């Protein structure tokens, strides 16, 4: 992303939007809480092309095979890069444009009731392609499944060990710092709610698609749920029907950031990328013709 000189009012993670139209300026003040402005979008993806694409990629990639999750994450990164309003956030009633495109997700160290979890965080660059995202996820998953504790989990572990009244006071202080963008970077280095998008792959644990709430903590304004894939009827424009394997996505957005048309066009881009996965081999910043 293009970097700009920091000005008064900017945060370390975002640039203050100084030329907003009056409607959006007032909206941020009238409706200050992110959780009060959640909206939900569902999208069904035809997996025909994606399944064939993944099978071909894995003919040569056997150590860490490509999966549907890798493609969804890469498609979200490209969509956010090309549709920058998705990468805005509102804190303290002010609109900000995030300085980078990022994603976060939880890695289960072991699939069991008592299996610990770790936080993975991906920083995307304009020149990244699907291959770069795949390698980045490989490194993150390997690190998360080791004995190493990620920075944000480490900070929470400390709060959990000290007396309860002290930890509550510390958390209230952090919430005040969060409002002004002053939370120490080490504490939120892997905090998922400071990313462009949080992704939860419910399909990996045999759950259908749903929606996840946003939070007033942090800056994340987009949450994506990946459901379990299933064979469902797909209707062509001429009315004919075929049974195909599909994937449902559930998106939770902050409706204050853009109008419905902008979100609609963004979701159509996401759908196009997932149903034409070869587009993900191009750099994130390269434009895509999709309508």
Give the residues covered by each predicted segment:
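C-terminal catalytic/motor cores of large multi-domain enzyme assemblies
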Residues: 1-291
């Amino acid at each position: 992303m293009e970097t700009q000189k920091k000005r008064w009012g900017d945060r370390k993670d975002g640039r203050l939007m100084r030329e907003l139209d009056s409607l959006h300026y007032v909206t941020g003040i009238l409706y200050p809480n992110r959780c009060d402005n959640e909206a939900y979008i569902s999208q069904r993806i035809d997996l025909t092309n994606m399944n064939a694409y993944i099978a071909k990629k894995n003919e040569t990639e056997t150590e860490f095979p490509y999966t549907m999750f890798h493609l969804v994450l890469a498609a979200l990164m490209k969509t956010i890069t090309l549709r920058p309003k998705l990468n805005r956030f509102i804190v303290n009633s002010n609109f900000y444009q995030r300085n980078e495109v990022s994603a976060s997700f939880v890695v289960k160290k072991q699939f069991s009731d008592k299996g610990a979890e770790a936080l993975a965080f991906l920083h995307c660059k304009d020149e990244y392609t699907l291959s770069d995202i795949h390698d980045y996820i490989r490194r993150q998953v390997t690190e998360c499944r080791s004995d190493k504790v990620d920075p944000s989990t480490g900070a929470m572990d400390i709060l959990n060990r000290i007396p309860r009244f002290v930890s509550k006071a510390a958390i209230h202080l952090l919430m005040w710092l969060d409002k002004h963008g002053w939370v120490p970077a080490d504490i939120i280095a892997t905090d998922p709610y400071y990313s462009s998008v949080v992704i939860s792959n419910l399909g990996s644990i045999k759950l259908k698609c749903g929606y996840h709430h946003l939070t007033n903590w942090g800056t994340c304004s987009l949450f994506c749920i990946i459901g379990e894939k299933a064979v469902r009827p797909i209707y062509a424009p001429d009315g004919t029907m075929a049974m195909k394997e599909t994937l449902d996505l559930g998106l939770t957005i902050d409706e204050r950031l853009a109008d419905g048309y902008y979100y609609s066009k963004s979701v159509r881009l996401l759908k196009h990328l997932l149903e034409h996965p070869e587009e993900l081999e191009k750099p994130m910043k390269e434009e895509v013709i999709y309508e």
